[in-house]
Swiss-Prot record:
<feature type="binding site">
    <location>
        <position position="91"/>
    </location>
    <ligand>
        <name>CTP</name>
    </ligand>
</feature>
<feature type="binding site">
    <location>
        <position position="8"/>
    </location>
    <ligand>
        <name>ATP</name>
    </ligand>
</feature>
<keyword id="KW-0692">RNA repair</keyword>
<feature type="binding site">
    <location>
        <position position="21"/>
    </location>
    <ligand>
        <name>Mg(2+)</name>
    </ligand>
</feature>
<dbReference type="Pfam" id="PF01743">
    <property type="entry name" value="PolyA_pol"/>
</dbReference>
<keyword id="KW-0460">Magnesium</keyword>
<dbReference type="InterPro" id="IPR006674">
    <property type="entry name" value="HD_domain"/>
</dbReference>
<dbReference type="Pfam" id="PF12627">
    <property type="entry name" value="PolyA_pol_RNAbd"/>
</dbReference>
<comment type="function">
    <text>Catalyzes the addition and repair of the essential 3'-terminal CCA sequence in tRNAs without using a nucleic acid template. Adds these three nucleotides in the order of C, C, and A to the tRNA nucleotide-73, using CTP and ATP as substrates and producing inorganic pyrophosphate. tRNA 3'-terminal CCA addition is required both for tRNA processing and repair. Also involved in tRNA surveillance by mediating tandem CCA addition to generate a CCACCA at the 3' terminus of unstable tRNAs. While stable tRNAs receive only 3'-terminal CCA, unstable tRNAs are marked with CCACCA and rapidly degraded.</text>
</comment>
<feature type="binding site">
    <location>
        <position position="11"/>
    </location>
    <ligand>
        <name>ATP</name>
    </ligand>
</feature>
<protein>
    <recommendedName>
        <fullName>CCA-adding enzyme</fullName>
        <ecNumber>2.7.7.72</ecNumber>
    </recommendedName>
</protein>
<dbReference type="GO" id="GO:0004810">
    <property type="term" value="F:CCA tRNA nucleotidyltransferase activity"/>
</dbReference>
<feature type="domain" description="HD">
    <location>
        <begin position="226"/>
        <end position="329"/>
    </location>
</feature>
<dbReference type="GO" id="GO:0001680">
    <property type="term" value="P:tRNA 3'-terminal CCA addition"/>
</dbReference>
<keyword id="KW-0067">ATP-binding</keyword>
<dbReference type="GO" id="GO:0000287">
    <property type="term" value="F:magnesium ion binding"/>
</dbReference>
<keyword id="KW-0479">Metal-binding</keyword>
């Protein structure tokens, strides 16, 4: 029996990155032998075991053969005779197809170390095209390692373009899992850009893909492509925060500008894009079973984000509406989230630093004014039942009016 450290742990060690988790491959063993020495079997499709002390995963070396469509259409074969080189051959990218043996020697039959030096994401073998999930994985790795100047090998990108017809065989959960992982990288915009380059964006996220045909007239700049503008905005959001709700809402904020393409003039100012976007976000989130917390914040942001840039001129009633729809009184962190959404817009805020800071301060101050109104005081004053909420609204509105009058 030989044990090898494999995959991401080896790659990250060579890149001098923190190793998050360790995966192992066992050569020369059998399921029964693993059980006999105290390992716990957890894999259903192929033999994977948990170490009795470290609880790290140990998989028996295996080969895979394509048997049907999708990423699950494989027949796995395990046997004591399967070598580490055969096991590594089934992996997606050369940088993920390396191992360390028990003596610390690097096993690198497919030149992963070379591609790390070249900063290339290159497929291991022709069998790459058999698993459509690899299109998403490569796009995610491109996003994850963009700050290290990794690029996709041209021959790998060609294969990805040939694989997109099988993408719809992937489960919605699997697509969202890869997308979520990409969204929390330092450069999530790279993930969607890669998907567009290989044709996958049009299949999986047609709402996003449509934006690349639409210009965005703004008062701050000349007409620019809405798709690229969205990618720039997502990049700015990723720089500002790790909050996936903020990042996703920024990604989806302008979806309404992309439809209906056959009815909207490409030179339109998209007056109705906010409401159009709500339906698109709802459908997209349902399609991929995206968590309610993320989808709800994104839908609200789509409808109300334009108001966030003009806090100074908003009437108290509109400020109250904003605080209500974003549920700020019960969830004060929402104020930080919506400010981050507004700060992510690179065009609106460019060269307007003092103005933008003032808008942010005004929004925070306005919310603080309303938050000081206590329900306890209202109850002490004798209000009961539904009259409590009505009086709470009235007092908050009055406080905002008084505050606004002092700003003039």
């Amino acid at each position: 029996m030989e044990k090898y450290l494999v995959g991401g742990a080896v790659r990250d060690a060579l890149l001098k990155l923190p190793v998050q988790e360790k995966d192992w491959v066992v050569v020369g063993s059998s399921p029964q032998e693993m059980l006999n020495i105290g390992y716990e079997q957890v894999g259903k499709d192929f033999p994977v075991f948990l170490h009795p002390e470290s609880h790290e995963e140990y998989a028996l070396a295996r080969t895979e053969r394509k048997s049907g469509q999708g990423y699950t259409g494989f027949i796995c074969h395990t046997a004591p005779s399967i070598t580490i080189e055969e096991d590594l051959y089934r992996r997606d990218l050369t940088i993920n197809a390396m191992a360390y043996d028990s003596h610390g020697n690097l096993i690198d039959p497919y030149h992963g170390q070379r591609d790390i030096k070249l900063r290339l994401l290159r497929h291991v073998s022709h069998t790459f095209h058999e698993d459509p999930l690899r299109v998403l994985r490569v796009a995610r790795f491109a996003a994850r390692f963009a700050h290290m100047n990794f690029a996709i090998a041209p021959e790998t990108l060609i294969l990805m373009k040939q694989m997109i017809h099988e993408l719809l065989s992937l489960s919605p959960e699997r697509i969202w899992t890869e997308t979520k992982k990409a969204l929390i990288t330092d450069n999530p915009q790279v993930y969607f850009t890669v998907l567009r380059h290989c044709g996958a964006l049009k299949i999986l996220f047609p709402e996003l893909d449509a934006l690349f045909d639409i210009p965005t007239p703004t008062q701050y700049c000349t007409k620019i492509n809405t798709g690229y503008y969205t990618m720039t905005t997502l990049s700015k959001a990723a720089y500002l925060t790790d909050d996936i709700s903020v990042r996703f809402s920024v990604l989806c904020r302008d979806l309404g500008k992309g439809i209906p393409l056959n009815k909207i003039n490409k030179n339109t100012k998209h007056h109705d894009h906010r409401k159009l976007g709500i339906t698109l976000i709802h459908n997209l989130c349902n399609r991929f079973k995206i968590p309610h917390e993320i989808r709800n914040f994104s839908k609200i942001t789509s409808e109300y984000h334009d108001y966030l840039y003009n806090v100074k001129i908003l009437k108290p009633e509109m400020l109250m509406t904003l605080f209500h729809v974003f549920d700020c009184w019960r969830r004060p962190n929402r104020i930080d989230q919506i400010i981050l959404v507004s700060q992510s817009d690179p065009i609106r805020w460019k060269n307007y630093n003092n103005y933008s800071l003032n808008q942010e301060n005004l929004l925070r101050t306005a919310f603080t004014v309303t938050k000081k109104i206590s329900t306890v005081d209202i109850i002490k004053d004798g209000f009961t039942g539904s009259n409590i909420s009505r009086e709470l609204y009235a007092r908050r509105l009055h406080a905002l009016n008084s505050w606004k009058n002092k700003q003039i």
